[in-house]
Amino acid sequence: MSAPIVQLAHAAFSVNRCPSCVSWSRTGILACATCHSIALYDPQKNVVISTLNGHTGRVNCVHWVQKNDCSAETELVSGGSDKKVIIWAIEKNKCEQPVAAEGHTEVVNAVHAVYTQRSENELLIVSAASDCTVRLWLRRNVKTECLQTLSFGKGFVLDVCISFLPGSLVPVLACGADDSRIHLYVLQNEQFEKTQVLHGHEDWIRGVEWAVTGQNLFLASCAQDCLIRIWKIFRKTAKENSKTEDENSIKLKENIFKVKEKDTETSYAVTLETVLTGHENSIYAVHWQPSFSRDGSIVQPMSLLSASMDKTMILWEPDEESGVWLEQVRVGEVGGNTLGFLGCQFSPDKSMILAHAFHGALHLWSRAPNKQNEWIPMVIISGHFDSVQDMRWDPDGQFVITVSADQTTRLFGPWKKKGQSHVTWHEIARPQIHGYDMQCLAMIGRFQFVSGADEKVLRVFAAPRNFIENFSNISCISVEKLLLNEDTNLPEGATVPALGLSNKAVFHGEILIQSTQEEGKYNSVSEQYSQPNFQPLNLTEPPTEDHLLQNTLWPEVQKLYGHGYEIFAVACNSAKTVIASACKASKREHAAIILWSTTSWKQLQSLSYHNLTVTQMAFSPDDEFLLVVSRDRNWSLWKKQEGIPEQTEPTFTLYASTDKNSCVHSRIIWACDWTPDSKYFVTGSRDKKVIVWGDCSLPSMNEEKSSALIRPCSSLLDTGDSITAVSVSQVLALDGSYIIAVGLDCGIIQLYKWKHSGTVNDWLKCLAMDQSLLSHTLTVKQLCWRSCLGRAGHDDRDNGDWIQLASCGADHCVKIFDVYRKAL
């Protein structure tokens, strides 16, 4: 069987900033809401299995629909900012035709669903939205209809959960609202009627969840008052109803309501079972341990998980002897500029617990072997929580660095677990945690990069020794090989001063002094609460979120001042001696490109030609040319001057360009790149066209003749959508053609082969990555080919058959693709 042209090696993502964005199925698959998609992730294998695309707005809630017999789930329900509720039928981790339920007029923020007791083809769905309504839907086979709309006036329902009354087929609905009350509805005469309002919480109710135990129904609720309340619903017998109470007896208050079912009236009582206190901030989620089947009966363990903005997650269980609910385990994150947890989940067998944080990070703990209440942090996927703006491979193709509007720079690399052949990708470091949205970056060396953000300053970072040692352990590359051409006098790590944005280097001597001071007495109270200090780590596996936040920063070695507005684009030549940078501009004087020396960090030259923002720049592989594209729909080509002595810094002069009379593109040019032989360059524009220009190897005497020589060498390729990214592989196809990847505004990535032939049909389309797993759901921001053959982290013999492509997009996602050369 032949290998597919493209397969996904990695997809990095984070979870959306909503309480109900993660749901864990009995098959061990996590459904995670990420941007406009739902990622199906296997935490055991550390791989994204599938991506469900159907929402056109942010996905705010997901829920695996549990079957009545506790068998594996096959359906998933989600709600989003596009006002839709979607039911997904999942078979073998792939989605059949999704069914959408439309009717809400505002954002859907909570969903839940149960199968009716009559048939699994009937699904009862409840959804809450910002339009102050709760809607109930019935899905029969493939048709979905709205049964009822419950209005809450001007109030909002923040969470919903539906179940069945004990010993009956009557559905009961719990709605947690912003009036600090829980509203209970019961189905009567084909309509849901309000039967009880549960008082007790003193702030917005953030989470509600039912659990059935024998003849009792328990409801767990949590709120911003930092408390958890557990309510009990049970059937009242005729004997209990007629029994008179002793006036001197002490008993919890019972709220009694009656339900008619098939001409039989039954009384039910609601009592407050317990109040759990232990969190110090708002509690956003509660989750019961999943029920399971044993000896033909359903067992519901009395274990409850809660997640709070105090950065902790607590596991609660009742004491076996007294029945008093007690805190069994408390886990959480320490340090870092974070805001706590929004949601929590049990694994199906309770061997693992998971929380997702305000900034989208997933935290996974596994129970230690043979130790009941000891939990160990585990490796889990991580990623950006806002648009990923730019990315680059390191020169040796061992890792990828990305920058995002979430104000972080992240480094992703491959990892092979000990004793396994399977390679997975993980976030290995977070070199920069900034105060401005990141925009662009360029690699200056293997362990040095320059980044630009929504500020006027370029910042240069270099890897510390601790990162290189840990990267060596994780990638199984010797430290000596990694440091072959690097400075040996490296700092150990970096830390951020309390009132600064710059990562300050920490050297070995400072760590020793710091540890000595910590052992001694403090001279003042302020010294006890000083800024977080760097702690060197010896890692053999990818770091957890706590370590990424505090111990993987890279020291800032230089700031480059010169631009008048926010940095928008940066590039570095192949020799790593010259940096080119540009900023946002609406005038010619501000659109000038500044060239910097990487040895002296001084300005070398200012190149002025364009009238509007320069969108991208690229040095030719032989360093002879600098290509610039701009919002003004033109490109300019700058040539390094010949005959300059080696001692002096290089200077560039305008070699060729287009203007308003000669430009071929009719809209903004977003992207450009060079072929590996430096003969041709490629431009991509919002006008949906890709053009190859050249031949740049032809001799020319002056700018006029050069501009005449540099002309379109290809036919105009119409991609059908705005082009936002272009990348040419440094490795040729087997037939000698150039391999060109094109990223579109709609999120699709297209692969083409092109060879200069002078004919109309010179483009050959190899593939359009428009499948749910391969494509992005929003704009492709950057594409970047690995500079060498093979797959990073692999040592198999067929490495030469593969090349790798990295992509990032406005959907917060970073993807690594394995491309099979022989199939192109």
From Swiss-Prot:
Pathway info: tRNA modification; 5-methoxycarbonylmethyl-2-thiouridine-tRNA biosynthesis
Q: Which CDD domains match?
A: WD40
Q: Which GO terms describe its biological process?
A: proteasome assembly; transcription elongation by RNA polymerase II; tRNA wobble uridine modification
Q: Which GO terms describe its molecular function?
A: endopeptidase activator activity
Mark the WD repeats by their residue spans: 14-51, 54-98, 103-147, 153-195, 200-241, 278-326, 336-375, 383-422, 433-471, 562-606, 609-648, 664-703, 718-764, 784-824
The alphabetical list of record keywords is:
Cytoplasm, Nucleus, Repeat, tRNA processing, WD repeat
Subcellular compartments: Cytoplasm; Nucleus
Which residue ranges does UniProt annotate as crossing the membrane?
none
GO CC field: cytoplasm; elongator holoenzyme complex; nucleus; proteasome complex
One Pfam family of this chain: WD40
- Which residues pair up as cystines? none
> What's the family?
Belongs to the WD repeat ELP2 family.
Record note on quaternary structure: Component of the elongator complex.
Q: What's this chain's function?
A: Component of the elongator complex which is required for multiple tRNA modifications, including mcm5U (5-methoxycarbonylmethyl uridine), mcm5s2U (5-methoxycarbonylmethyl-2-thiouridine), and ncm5U (5-carbamoylmethyl uridine). The elongator complex catalyzes the formation of carboxymethyluridine in the wobble base at position 34 in tRNAs.
Protein name per Swiss-Prot or TrEMBL? Elongator complex protein 2
Ranked from the top, the taxonomy reads:
Eukaryota, Metazoa, Chordata, Craniata, Vertebrata
